[in-house]
Amino acid sequence: MRVLLVCLASLLVCLKTADSHSLPQKDYDTDSNKHDITDPLNDTSGNNSSSVHDNFSGIFDYSTTRFIARSVTRGGKKESMGIYAYKNGKVKMILEDSLAVSPWSSKSRAYLGNKDGIYVYDTETEKLEKYGNLSDNVIGIVKENRSDDLYILTEDHVVYKVTEEGTKKVKINEAEHVEKIALDWDDNLYYIGANDHPYVVTSDGAKKIEGLPVNSTRTFISRPPIKIEHGAWFMCEKQAYIIYPNATSEPYVFNDQEKLEYEKTVRALKTILSQVDNQPVE
C-alpha cells in the first residue's frame, strides 16, 4: 500500500525536474503498510466566499479546520477509514465510511459525501448533521462558490447538481464515465473521465480539454489553490496546468515565492499527517 498525499489541489506534488521553476523535488507517493490518505486539508476558513484563493497565505492557520480522508487498501480495493478533522493541533474522526469532502468551503462548514448521502459539519460547533434527504453513495462532492448548491459524484460515476438544501438533485447528462469532479471560482464544472482526461461542461455539452499530454495518468483536478481568476487546476504526471472553460489549457509555472511557501506547507503537512498516521486502524 502507499500513502497518496493530494494536498491543496496537489500543490505538494513536485513538477518536472527539467523545469527551472519547478518545486523542490520530494516524493509524496511513499510506501506505507497502514493506509492511504487522500484529499487532506480542505479549507473551511471562510476566506474564499467572494474571491479567489490568495496563494498559500495562511493555509495552515492553527485554528482553521482541515480535513483528511483516510482509506486502507485491501486486496487491491480501497476501503474508507473515515474523514478526520484537524484543528488546534488535534485530530479526530468525524465521519466513518466517507472519502468525499467539499474543498474550499466559503462558510464555517464542510459538506461530506457518505454511503447514505450528504452530511454537513460545522467547524465552529464541531457538530455533524445529515444534510437533505438524499441516500446516494457519494464519492465526490464540490460546492459552488456563489451559492450553497452542490455537485455530487455517485458510486456509479454519475454527476448530479444538488439544490434546495439537499432535497433535490438533477442529473448532469453531459458528464459521462466520471472519475473526479471540480469547479472553478466561476462555478464552471470540470471532470476527469474514464480515460484520465479532463473535460469541461458547457451549454453545448462536455468538451475535451485540449493541449494536454495524451494517455495521461496520475491525474488530479480541483479549484485553483493559487490566485487565478478563471479556470481549474489540473495535475498530470507531476506537471501543473490551468484548464479553462473554453476547453484550452496551459502549463503553470511556479514563482520563487510560491516555492518558499511550498516548503512551509510541506513541514506543516508532515506534522498533521503524522498524527493521522498514528490513528488506530481496525
Model-predicted segments: where are they?
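N-terminal, post-signal-peptide region of Sec/Tat-exported proteins
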Residues: 50-80
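Conserved beta-propeller blade signature
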Residues: 66-69, 109-112, 119, 149-152, ...
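A short beta-strand motif characteristic of beta-propeller blades
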Residues: 43-49, 87-95, 126-133, 165-172, ...
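Sequence/structural signature of beta-propeller modules
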Residues: 1-53, 262-282
